[in-house]
UniProtKB/Swiss-Prot annotation:
Species per Swiss-Prot/TrEMBL record: Shouchella clausii (strain KSM-K16)
Role played: Probable enzyme that may play an important role in cell wall biology.
EC class (word): transferase
The protein's assembly and partners: Monomer.
Pathway: Cell wall biogenesis; peptidoglycan biosynthesis
Principal subcellular localization: other
Residue span(s) of domain LysM: 2-46
Protein name per its UniProtKB record: Putative L,D-transpeptidase YkuD
Domain notes: LysM domains are thought to be involved in peptidoglycan binding.
């Protein structure tokens, strides 16, 4: 079972949107929670996601180094170059999980999109390989297409993603 810890300003609606599930599904999974009285630190069950402790993979992102590191049971498997958000549209920092995958999303997203548990943010490919290594995105983590395809084939939905400055 996967739990989300409520952050300042979040509502059940915003949490449902972040995890791409319906509000009714979220309420059904949390029958003892009053949707109008959430508090910071409260644990909310997110239906449909596995317990993250059962997933041996983890992704660490360093915005300043423009690197995404894939770990397996705490050991580095591979380090990928990435592009991140520019000054006005910075990549959010914090702890997230991969909530879905969409091959061939089209346009600037390259050949793969993996949604993070923050609405409108994800890890994706690119139609502009020269952007990798720079701070040029609208906040997403951009990778070479071959790299994001390899990553998506390796990590399951529910994989933890830690993004640091």
């Amino acid at each position: 079972m996967f739990f989300h810890s409520v952050q300042q300003g979040e509502t059940l609606s915003s949490i449902a949107a972040d995890y791409r599930i319906s509000l009714s599904h979220l309420i059904q999974a949390n029958p003892t929670i009053n949707p109008n009285q959430l508090f910071v630190g409260q644990s909310i069950v997110i239906p449909g996601l596995p317990n993250p402790n059962t997933i041996p993979y983890e992704i660490h992102v360093s915005l300043s180094q423009h690197q995404l590191t894939l770990l397996h049971n705490g050991s580095v498997v591979k380090i990928y170059p990435i592009a991140v958000g520019k000054m006005l549209t910075q990549t959010p920092t914090g702890n997230f999980v991969i909530v879905n995958k969409a091959p061939n999303p089209g346009g600037p997203f390259g050949t793969m999109w993996m949604s993070l548990s923050k609405l409108h943010y994800g890890i994706h490919g690119t139609n502009d390989p020269s952007s990798i290594g720079k701070s040029v995105s609208h906040g997403c983590i951009r990778m070479h297409n071959k790299d994001v395809e390899e990553l998506a084939a390796t990590v399951p939905i529910g994989t933890r993603v830690r993004i640091e400055p």
